[in-house]
Amino acid sequence: AMAKAIEDAIAALQYKDADYTKVDAAIAKANALNKNDYKDFSGVEAAVNAVVRDKNITEQSEVDAMAKAIEDAIAALQYKDADYTKVDAAIAKANALNKNDYKDFSGVEAAVNAVVRDKNITEQSEVDAMAKAIEDAIAALQYKDADYTKVDAAIAKANALNKDNYKDFTGVEAAVNAVTRGKNLTEQTEVDAMAKAIEDAIAALQYKDADYTKVDAAIAKAN
C-alpha cells in the first residue's frame, strides 16, 4: 500500500509551466508594427498563430523556437517602397519646359539630379521633400527677357527723322511712347508688334507740301 501511495504521488506530479516570456515579448513586438507598412506581413502572422500555449518546462525548447520564429519573421520584413508619384510628376513638369526660355535653369536640373530612388515608406517625407525641391525650383524660374532689337531699331529710325518735314508726326510719337519695356520671352510677339507699330507709323508719314510762295512771286513778277 505504501508503494502504491508513492506511485500515486509520483503520478500526480505536474511539471512547471514553460516560460513564455520571450513568446509574449515577440508577439507584443509584432502587434506594435503597422502591417500596412510592409510588403508582406503574412510570415509574422503565421508565426504568431503557430504559438501553442500550455507547454511545460520539458518543452521549453519548443516554446523558445516559437519565439524565435516570430522574431525571425519580423527581422525578414521588408518595408513597402515609398511613393514617388509626386517626384515623377515634378520631373515630368521640369522635362516639359524649354530650358533655353529661362535665365537660369540650373536649379531645376540640380533638384532633379538630387532625386534618390529606392527609398522605403518610412522615408516618405524625404521623398516628398525631393518633389517639393523640384516644384520650388520650377516656381523660382525667370523667363529670359524679350528681344527689343527691332523696337530699338525702329525708335532710332524715328528719332533720325525731322518731324517738321511731315504733315503729322503724332502717329510715330504715339507708337514710340506706347513701347513697354521689361517684357519677357513669352511676350515676344507683343514686343514685335510694338516695333511694327512704329515702322507702320513711319511708313504712313506724309511730307508737307513744298512752299511755292517764292516761285509764285517770281512768276507774278515775270508777268
Predicted regions and their residues:
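Beta-rich interaction/scaffold domains
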Residues: 1-223
